[in-house]
Every structure is written in structure tokens, then in C-alpha cells.
Amino acid sequence: SKYYEQVGKSDKEITEEIAFDLPNGWYWCRLKDICSIFTGATFKKEEATITRKGIRILRGGNISPFELKIKDDDIFLTKDKVKEDILLKENDILTPAVTSLENIGKMARVDSDMSDTTVGGFVFIIRLHLINRWFSKYILYLLSSPFMIDFMKSITNKSGQAFYNIGKERLSMALLPIPPLTEQYRIVTQIEKLFEQLR
């Protein structure tokens, strides 16, 4: 079967981009169609402090697979240096934009609004249009899958000796398999059961 994408008023064939056929009720969509992707605060080194006052800035080292870690050596910026719309919200998904090869695809989800925290300029915030816990967890696990990590590695550019840069535009064009909401719930609960067994 052939797959098409509507671009403006015309249809473009994308069969070659489709990795596999999907079960009934599932559909393919581009990441850009379900979220906004943006980076965090940019600042000069001398503007950052470790005083624990103001807005906490999380960096790549704060992101572990499926877990956001608050650290003792986190840096802070004064509130006037941080735009309100980049403060972390529940269901945001965070991933390093510039990182080492083995850390490409490392993702963490924000469990509740963090009105005094954002990320630095080398971290992506993936903010979903649909505010739903199961959907954000499904997207988190999907983006962390070997299938998606391979895609992310394929779109990186090497920057410097050991760092890789994930292009926002190319990431936004990723094709994702999306199941119905009831199926998302089943997939997420099954994955979380397996995580419990591994703990």
C-alpha cells in the first residue's frame, strides 16, 4: 500500500519514509504536528550563579533515561533573564540537543509544573499540544525506543570533537506511529509494569 501526506493543497507520496505497516486504528504523524519543540534559556557564563535563588537551569547532565535529576551543582538565573513560556510544565519531554553519541535519545518527562525551573539552551523542550498524561508517556517511551534513537542518530551533525548536534527542523519531521488513546494507555501501563519488575 502507498502512503501520502497532505502538504498544502497537494498530496506527496511518503511511502519510502514509512518504516512499517500499522494495525487498524493507528496512524503515522510527524512530530511537528503534535508538539512545539524549543530550547531553553541562553545566557552568559557570568550571569549564572549557584545561589539557589531565581530560576534553576537544568542541563544535559540532569537528564537520565526517564528521569529528571535535580543536582546540588545546578545553576540559577535571575527571573528577568528567563522567559515565562520556557518554564517547565507537566508533560513536557526533555532531551539534550547537543550531546555525546551515547546520550542521543536520552529523554525525561516533567511530572508536574515547575514554575521555578527551565533548561539551558542545549536542551530541547518537547511540549505536546494535547495535554494528556498517557499521551505524553507514550511519546516519551516511543522517542526513547531503539527505532527513534536510530532516527535521531541519523539526523545529527558532529559539532566539535565529541559532541553531536540534533537539528530541530529534522527532528520535527520524525514520523511517529500513533495508536488510539485506549491503546496508548495499555502500552504505557505494560511498559511501567516491566519497569517495576526491573527495579
Question: At which residue positions do the language-model features occur?
Answer:
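Sequence-specific dsDNA recognition surfaces
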Residues: V7, D11-E17, K32-E47, G61-I93
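Non-catalytic DNA-recognition/assembly elements of restriction-modification systems
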Residues: K12-A41, I178-T189, E196-R199
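Generic, well-ordered alpha-helical scaffold segments in large soluble proteins
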Residues: I34-A41, L94-A97, H129, L142-P146, ...
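Short, ligand-facing micro-motifs at secondary-structure edges
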Residues: I63-I75, I93-G120, K137-Y141, M148-N157, ...
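A short glycine-rich beta-alpha junction/loop motif
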Residues: D116-F124, K158-I178
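Short, conserved charged micro-motifs
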Residues: N132-K137, Y185
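Amphipathic alpha-helical coiled-coil/heptad-repeat segments
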Residues: S145, I149-D150, S154, K168-R199
